[in-house]
Amino acid sequence: MKKGIVLHKSSLNYGDDIQSLAAYKLVGRPDYILDRENLHLSDVNENIQLLCNGWYMENPQNWPPAENIYPFFISLHVTHNNNTIDFFFSKKLIDYYKRFEPIGCRDYHTVRLFRKIGIKAYYSGCLTLTLENKFNEKDRTDEILFVDAFNKNLPVELRTKYFNQLVPPTIRDKIKFINHSHSNPNMSIEERFKNAELLIERYSKAHLVVTSRIHCALPCVALGTPVLFLDVGFNTKKSRNRFEGVTNYFNTLNNNYFPYSGIDPVGLIFRRTELYKYYFKGKEIKYNWESPPQNPVNIGGLRKELKSKVSNFLNS
């Protein structure tokens, strides 16, 4: 049987591409790379074993995959956006899921959603935790990468103003800013994977990565690069659900450093009326920038288990 992986072919988020790249590396050279949002329209005439991981989905009306696709569900997250929950967990799909259970989920909330309709499900972690650092420690730079670090909690016009209040002057010349998104929905698969590889290489060599992006943080954990995750501004229920079983892998900062960041009435009023500009007093982040703490969880066992499950599926 042919082998395949999924890719969101019009995504503007490199995190999606990194998740697909992790799957690509596990499969080897897949015969097919199928569009995550159009798995129901398989134009392939042969049967495919599909490694089915990632975030689902923008177009839930296009679910489930075509009959010739035999999915291995692992590292799955089901969003509350776009009425996806209604489509994914309708009674008519129970028999479909029964064929392919247990379902591996990257967060505990998704586990509960499947179990609620009687489908066997387990916490698998994310496939990006299988990425490996091909460089040596001597290749590490002194770069401190800020990857979309303040996107969720500081308005654009305030990021520069308050950045200098948050980080000490001794490290500012080591900081580089990286954007984890792009503006080209028509980017080729080759270019997507090339850019994802370049990001992984840079994360592999970094001294520290500060981010608010899950799929920057998790790859860095896999690569052995210290992560400081800004768990700030993610106050909606769907955001918190997405984090269950994820944020324990790295060190985090919370709202203590970023008042008025949430969706509470006071925070909303202060931002919308721009009172934020006058009442936000950034305080220097207390953190060991020169010798950042290692990530708190040893993922060796989980990485081995993920690889084993994928290998068993591909060889079945």
Predicted regions and their residues:
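Active-site anion-handling motifs in enzyme catalytic cores
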Residues: M1-S316
